[in-house]
């Protein structure tokens, strides 16, 4: 629910942002793309800065408390955004929202990871993104309707109600790790018996050693050297404070983070350029711009779970390679509507169809980066019991993953905005198609496969 709320509050202002810039702050039309991209990048930049500290704090303090704090900051940021009377305050609101987003996502994903069976990570991540895509899908439409009918005050009122409900529900959640402290002795004995039974079963690493690419277990690879994940040296003070840093000796973890970066790069670009492109091509209102986002986000909802199952079944290599390869022609098509080869009505349909095709590709590439990163980290955790502390490595992992993701979300609006403003949507699409093609090749060659040695 928290991730859903966060995306709603992010997306609800997207169709209204260019109109707020023009109507409230009198930004000239020629500079709207620059300001819109800048504010989206400010949000993502704050998320980048706070992602790793949020992961560290969650690993030390627990995810539930941090999650609640993130939602409170999100409420404050939304209020400042709604009632700001200067561009400086608007920047402050985006900084606060970016900070709270880093906290909510890092702590939220850690809470999910703590309750999920390792062999179901792909479908779980896919299902989560499919579910929250409903918020991503509905938010721009809702924001367009609310802004057109009641102005920014109506947008804030709905956002505040959603946050209040989420905070109330979050107060009822008991963290899994904290719940163990209150279990009765008989429940603890029962849990211990179950643990003994599980201990006799093969671990994730052992199971993967007996499988090959194409079996339904996490991101399959041919990595059978478990000794390479053992820590056999004295660690420095920084690595002791942030144990996950040691895992970056494994090149696969860097590649997993790269996948998250590229995925977010594309998302940030669409978020920043679709509203201005739709207004420029078709002179759409904020409501109509919001409706255009349905074409991009609907495939997330329809295909997210299925794409996650494919990752669990066929591995991260197949999903990442096919997804980014599929995006290449879809991104190249982005410049077609601006040529106005058909009537306006047909051109609108063409624009939405192209966005939908890109949405399909984005749905496919959602899970591989997360699943690959979790797989590598799990190998280190199994090989080094106790190294990551009582709360495990996953909060720190999601902190670093969020760092890469939000870096992409920050770079996307800036790069996409500049390319669109200087050269047009066709050139922008061609540049991003090249990036997607290179990512597909890298995924085919290196993702989900054994690398010869660790770095460092």
From Swiss-Prot:
Gene Ontology CC: membrane
Subcellular localization(s) per the UniProt record: Membrane
Database matches in Pfam families: MFS_1 (PF07690)
Top-level division of the source organism's lineage: Eukaryota
Regions that span the bilayer: 1-21, 38-58, 72-92, 125-145, 154-174, 255-275, 284-304, 318-338, 348-368, 398-418, 427-447
Alphabetical keyword list: Membrane, Transmembrane, Transmembrane helix, Transport
Role summary: MFS-type transporter; part of the gene cluster that mediates the biosynthesis of pyrrolopyrazines, secondary metabolites showing insecticidal activity. Probably involved in the secretion of peramine and other pyrrolopyrazines.
Family: Belongs to the major facilitator superfamily. TCR/Tet family.
Protein name in UniProt: MFS-type transporter ppzB
Biological source species: Metarhizium majus (strain ARSEF 297)
Organism ancestry: Eukaryota, Fungi, Dikarya, Ascomycota, Pezizomycotina
Gene: ppzB
């Amino acid at each position: 629910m928290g991730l859903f709320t966060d995306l709603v509050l992010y997306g609800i202002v997207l169709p209204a942002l260019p109109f707020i810039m023009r109507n409230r702050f009198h930004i000239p039309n020629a500079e709207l793309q620059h300001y819109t991209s800048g504010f989206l990048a400010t949000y993502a930049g704050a998320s980048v800065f706070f992602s790793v500290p949020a992961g560290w704090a969650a690993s030390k303090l627990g995810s539930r408390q941090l999650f609640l704090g993130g939602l409170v900051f999100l409420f404050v940021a939304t209020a400042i955004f709604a009632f700001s009377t200067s561009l400086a305050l608007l920047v402050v609101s985006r900084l606060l929202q970016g900070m709270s987003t880093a906290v909510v996502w890092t702590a939220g994903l850690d809470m999910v990871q703590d309750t999920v069976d390792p062999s179901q990570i792909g479908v779980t991540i896919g299902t989560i993104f499919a579910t929250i895509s409903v918020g991503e899908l509905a938010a721009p439409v809702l924001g367009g309707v609310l802004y057109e009918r009641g102005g920014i005050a109506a947008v804030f009122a709905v956002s505040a109600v959603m946050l209040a409900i989420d905070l109330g529900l979050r107060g009822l959640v008991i963290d899994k790790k904290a719940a163990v402290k209150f279990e009765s002795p008989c429940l603890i004995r029962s849990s211990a018996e179950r643990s003994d039974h599980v201990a006799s079963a093969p671990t994730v690493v052992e199971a993967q050693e007996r499988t090959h690419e194409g079996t339904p277990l996490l991101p399959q690879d041919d990595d059978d050297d478990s000794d390479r994940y053992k820590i056999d040296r004295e660690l420095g003070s920084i690595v002791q404070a942030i144990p996950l840093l040691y895992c970056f000796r494994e090149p696969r973890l860097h590649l997993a983070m790269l996948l998250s970066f590229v995925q977010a790069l594309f998302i940030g670009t669409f978020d920043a350029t679709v509203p201005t492109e739709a207004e420029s091509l078709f002179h759409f209102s904020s409501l109509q711009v919001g409706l255009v986002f349905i074409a991009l986000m609907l495939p997330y909802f329809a295909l997210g779970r299925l794409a996650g199952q494919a990752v669990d079944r066929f591995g991260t290599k197949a999903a990442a390679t096919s997804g980014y390869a599929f995006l290449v022609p879809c991104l190249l098509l982005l410049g077609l509507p601006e040529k106005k080869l058909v009537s306006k009505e047909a051109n609108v349909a063409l624009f939405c169809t192209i966005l939908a095709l890109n949405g399909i590709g984005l749905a496919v590439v959602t899970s591989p980066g997360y699943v690959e990163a979790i797989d590598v980290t799990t190998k280190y955790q199994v090989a080094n019991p106790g190294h990551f502390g009582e709360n495990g490595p996953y909060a720190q992992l999601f902190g670093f993953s969020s760092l890469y993701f939000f870096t992409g979300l920050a770079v996307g609006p800036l790069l996409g905005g500049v390319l669109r403003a200087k050269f047009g949507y066709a050139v922008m699409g061609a540049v991003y198609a090249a990036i997607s093609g290179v990512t597909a090749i890298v995924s085919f060659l290196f993702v989900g496969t054994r690398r010869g040695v660790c770095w460092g």
